[in-house]
Structure formats: C-alpha cells, structure tokens
C-alpha cells in the first residue's frame, strides 16, 4: 500500500522529481530550514524519516527531526563524512580519504542518535558513493524502542 503521506522538506526549491512532487500524497515544503520548521507545518507524527542533507552536520539536523517523530518510528540518515569531520580532514574536492576519519564521522552520528534516546538498528556503507566519490554511510535508528 505504501506511504499515506510524505512530507518533503528542503532548503532549496524545485529539487524533487516532478513525478513525485505531483503525487497527492506528497507535501513539498521548499525553502525551509528544518531548524525553523514549525510543528504546525507537519501536524502528523512521522513514522519514518529519511534524511539526506548537505553542508550541515547531522548533529544539528537529527535533534530537529526528533521533534516530528512518532513515539515508535524509524529514521534512516545518510552520513556524509565531509560534513561531519573537522575541515582539516577534508581533502581536495571535498573528499574524506582517511578511513579512520570516515569511521569517526559515522560514530559521531550514531552517538547523536543515542543521545536522543534512539536505538542504533544498523549502519552500512552506502552502495552509492557521493557525487564527488565520497564513501558515505546509511544509519538506521529506531525511535521509542525498548533498548
């Protein structure tokens, strides 16, 4: 049956494929930073959040996502190491080449989820590299789970 409603929040505009944005179940909220998003704009409790952000750390974003989550829900977050590590760890072209730095970036995000009371349910290297070739990760959290 699929999703009954999807809220798509983006600081940009017109980023979503028109075939998706035309779907009546999709509510597009463009030009909106999640840090300024009001609960009244997403009145439903969210069962699943899929987070793919750039130029900002998930350390900032995930606590904001948490405001909208249902008591028992899930979060899938794409971890982009270049936005999680110190600038000195980011090489030419925005690539994080040091495997230890990438691991630290992933662990940092997992720690954020745990501080929010989320259970880490999985972590894997993304099968798709970032646009510039960065190795990225997918983190899966369960919100409101018994630990």
Language model regions located:
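C-terminal substrate-binding/active-site "lid" region of AdoMet-derived donor-dependent transferases
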Residues: 82-121
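Residue-level signal for inorganic ion chemistry
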Residues: 16, 80, 133
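Short loop/edge segments at beta-strand edges and connector loops
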Residues: 30-32, 122-125
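Conserved beta-strand signature within the Rossmann-like core of class I S-adenosyl-L-methionine
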Residues: 72-81, 85-86
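A short glycine-rich, Lys/Arg-flanked "PGG" loop and its adjoining helix->strand segment in the class I
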Residues: 59-76
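Conserved S-adenosyl-L-methionine
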Residues: 1-5, 73
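S-adenosyl-L-methionine
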Residues: 4-60
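Core SAM-dependent methyltransferase catalytic element
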Residues: 128-147
């Amino acid at each position: 049956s699929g999703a009954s409603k999807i809220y798509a929040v983006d600081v940009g505009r017109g980023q979503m494929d028109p075939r998706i944005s035309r779907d009546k179940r999709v509510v597009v909220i463009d030009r909106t930073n999640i840090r300024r998003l009001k609960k009244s704009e997403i009145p439903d409790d969210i069962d699943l959040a899929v987070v793919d952000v750039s130029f900002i750390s998930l350390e900032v974003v995930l606590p904001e996502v948490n405001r909208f989550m249902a008591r028992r829900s899930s979060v899938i977050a794409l971890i982009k190491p270049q936005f999680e590590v110190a600038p000195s760890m980011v090489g030419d072209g925005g690539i994080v080449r040091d495997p230890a730095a990438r691991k630290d970036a992933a662990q940092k995000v997992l720690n954020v989820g745990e501080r929010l009371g989320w259970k880490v349910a999985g972590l894997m290297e993304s099968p798709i590299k970032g646009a510039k070739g960065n190795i990225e990760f997918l983190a899966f959290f369960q919100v409101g789970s018994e630990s």
